Amino acid sequence: MADRLTQLQDAVNSLADQFCNAIGVLQQCGPPASFSNIQTAINKDQPANPTEEYAQLFAALIARTAKDIDVLIDSLPSEESTAALQAASLYKLEEENHEAATCLEDVVYRGDMLLEKIQSALADIAQSQLKTRSVTHSHSLPDS
């Protein structure tokens, strides 16, 4: 996973791409402008362009990307954050990490204990089945 600055740069690049695409679609689909002193030939056979749908699509994309950029900017450390605050935050994160590691070790230990019990039970079942088979096999043999 990329760091926050890389994510922010990617989001800004995505926003720039969306603006370029929106402008390109507007140029392609927009009706020609009329100039009073210049006569232009307008192709009357052009099909109706779904410019409203494009406008809504690009507006939604641009708005969502702008919100993503705001969230990424808000997640960056502020200038007000001093070294002492950062150290305290790191210390707290380390404590939480140690607590999680202890909890994980406990869960692994309990899992190992359960595994031993299950393996012991499976061994007992296998022994019982072997004994049962040997007893039934010896009873089924005809006497000579």
Curated annotation (Swiss-Prot):
Q: Which SUPFAM superfamilies match?
A: Mediator hinge subcomplex-like
Give the main localization category.
nucleus
Protein localization: Nucleus
**One GO molecular-function annotation for this sequence?**
ubiquitin protein ligase activity
Q: Which Pfam families match?
A: Med21 (PF11221)
- Gene3D superfamilies per the record? Mediator complex, subunit Med21 (6.10.280.10)
Return the InterPro entries for the record. Med7/Med21-like (IPR037212), Mediator_Med21 (IPR021384)
Keywords for this protein: Activator, Nucleus, Transcription, Transcription regulation
Q: List the disulfide bonds.
A: none
GO BP, one annotated term: protein ubiquitination
GO cellular component terms listed in the entry, alphabetical order: core mediator complex; mediator complex; nucleoplasm; nucleus; ubiquitin ligase complex
Write out the tissue specificity statement of the associated record: Expressed in brain, heart, kidney, liver, lung, skeletal muscles, spleen and testis.
Known partners and oligomeric status: Component of the Mediator complex, which is composed of MED1, MED4, MED6, MED7, MED8, MED9, MED10, MED11, MED12, MED13, MED13L, MED14, MED15, MED16, MED17, MED18, MED19, MED20, MED21, MED22, MED23, MED24, MED25, MED26, MED27, MED29, MED30, MED31, CCNC, CDK8 and CDC2L6/CDK11. The MED12, MED13, CCNC and CDK8 subunits form a distinct module termed the CDK8 module. Mediator containing the CDK8 module is less active than Mediator lacking this module in supporting transcriptional activation.
| Cited function | Component of the Mediator complex, a coactivator involved in the regulated transcription of nearly all RNA polymerase II-dependent genes. Mediator functions as a bridge to convey information from gene-specific regulatory proteins to the basal RNA polymerase II transcription machinery. Mediator is recruited to promoters by direct interactions with regulatory proteins and serves as a scaffold for the assembly of a functional preinitiation complex with RNA polymerase II and the general transcription factors.
Task: Give the record's family classification.
Answer: Belongs to the Mediator complex subunit 21 family.
Q: What is this protein called?
A: Mediator of RNA polymerase II transcription subunit 21
Q: Which organism is it from?
A: Mus musculus (Mouse)
What are the top taxonomic ranks of the organism?
Answer: Eukaryota, Metazoa, Chordata, Craniata, Vertebrata
